[in-house]
Amino acid sequence: MKIKTGARVFALSALAAMMISAPALAKIEEGKLVIWINGDKGYNGLAEVGKKFEKDTGIKVTIEHPDKLEEKFPQVAATGDGPDIIFWAHDRFGGYAQSGLLAEVTPDKAFQDKLFPFTWDAVRYNGKLIAYPVAVEALSLIYNKDLVPNPPKTWEEIPKLDKELKAKGKSALMFNLQEPYFTWPLIAADGGYAFKFENGKYDVKDVGVDSAGAKAGLTFLVDLIKNKHMNADTDYSIAEAAFNKGETAMTINGPWAWTNIDKSKI
């Protein structure tokens, strides 16, 4: 089984989107727009856009980044309060939409054609669009050039590389094995899937975690652990610390990891 370290393996992504609050539409305050976004998700950039919008339209824009935004939004929106617009990852959309907290959006085809189709799939609920995609975050293989000048092209190369690095007191790869967000790309790389996606929707009766592809990917991961090339107890903090200290040559992480990587100066 040749599992490449390219885009197919690390296709799992989190899609951030702009959602319009349905309760807010019911009690719009003329001349004012309140937007919520997480503090680490382009807050400063959005604030600048808000200033320009305010200057162009005369509508006051307030950008806020409350703690635990994703938990506070349904609480306040359920009572008709909260922001007019919220930016968050698409994994929360279904629950919000099911509770009637989001307004349907109707971008024309010309606008939709500007973005990849899968981004619209991520913000569709019961056949209706409930948000605008604004960004996609994906996992990637991050490597230390001092330890691995040329990263492996297939997963099958990792055991040999790990043995070579172990002789130098290092290891080849560490990443979070406690959350399926990080392990799923490997499981899905050879055709594994959670629910079958057809005709624009998921079939919850067609579960693919027991498929041949899923078994192949998981078996490969288990073999890496059995052969001591990886440790089953590795979590996010352990993997991050090992990579940033130069103890392991490679890790699998997202763009949010780069701040600490840069600080480590490896």
Range-by-range predicted roles:
Residues 130-134, 139, 159-206, 248:
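Extracytoplasmic/periplasmic solute-binding protein
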Residues 107-115, 165, 193-216, 263-265:
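Short, solvent-exposed loop/beta-turn-alpha elements that line the ligand-binding surface or hinge
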Residues 65-73, 91, 156-157, 231-245:
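Short helix-initiation/N-cap motifs at beta->coil->alpha
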Residues 161-162, 203-233:
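Glycine-centered hinge/linker elements that transmit conformational signals in sensory
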Residues 2, 12-13, 25-95, 109-112, ...:
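Conserved N-terminal structural module of periplasmic/extracytoplasmic solute-binding proteins
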Residues 71-82, 99, 147, 163-167, ...:
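Short helices/loops that flank or line small-molecule/ion binding pockets
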Residues 219-266:
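Extracytoplasmic/periplasmic substrate-binding proteins
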Residues 90-140, 150-162, 185-186, 213:
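Hinge/lid segment of periplasmic solute-binding proteins
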